[in-house]
Amino acid sequence: NWKLTVELIERAELTHIFEGKDPNYKEITFFAPPSLSILRYVWDKASGKEQFPGDPDRWRALSEDEKNHPEHLVQALDKDWCREMVLRHVIKGKHLKDEIAFRNRDYEIEAEEQTGGTDFTCESGNKLRAYREKTNYGGVTDAGAIFMYLYSFDAMEMVPLASPDIQPLNGVVHALNYNYVLGRI
């Protein structure tokens, strides 16, 4: 489900990038957080576990019914925070799964010696390494599925992708897994 992802993009006032209407962003790659990741993040923040990334008065002003409708939760978030969060997931240019290098299995993905993967800098400045890995099948090495992952140098965390290579008109969307924690990229 992408409802809250769209809400986050709209709240950030970045729809022009996703619609291909910005001349600086003719094509983009979007590592898309699913709605569940956004919802979980906002509820955790709103429940007081951590500082809410928006106006606490706007949050408190929401009725209980509004708090149960996720689109209202996103509207309570700070626009600049939403912009930063969306841009942490955007790279200029279209980068398909098949263009991403395989990880060198001799080294951990974050190791200096790692010669595999493809390094990117997102539009907010955070650094990622995208990489593919082959799996074994039926006892045959590398005969199984090929998965794509991200490694965030900022968060020092590996992020699995659920569905790579969704191709809208102006780029590519790589859907992040449902267990992705918003901002850990």
Spans of model-derived segments:
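Mature, structured domains of secreted/extracytosolic soluble proteins
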Residues: 1-185
